Amino acid sequence: MEFLVTMTTRVPDSMPADAVERVRAREAARSRELAAQGKLLRLWRPPLRPGEWRTLGLFAADDNGELEQLLASMPPRSWRTDDVTPLGAHPNDPVGQGITIAPGKGPEFLIATTIMVPPGTPAQVVDDTVAREARRAPQ
């Protein structure tokens, strides 16, 4: 079963910055472990306002009890509240339609673009523009 979990963290004002960083490092390490076990499927960071620390997570667990154990194992549980939404299959889910996607990868689209160079444009301008775009493409 899959669960969407909104995790909202409120760090105590009295907590030293170095202690917060240590907890965040432990959280990152535990997240990697859960991902390797196939229990943590995805994490997203929604747009945040100043002072917010919120994460959306997609978890796989056999039941609510196992999910609670997984969440309890992730620091900083004492600073965090979790809002859990159990997810069920949707009749239009691509997987149910036989369309499988690699985790983290959506459908791919082939897009053809035609660039028209205005008549009379010097060849050097075209070459420079193509070179600039080639440098930017990996970004």
Listing of model-derived features with the role each one plays in the protein:
Residues 1-139:
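Conserved, structured core segments of small domains
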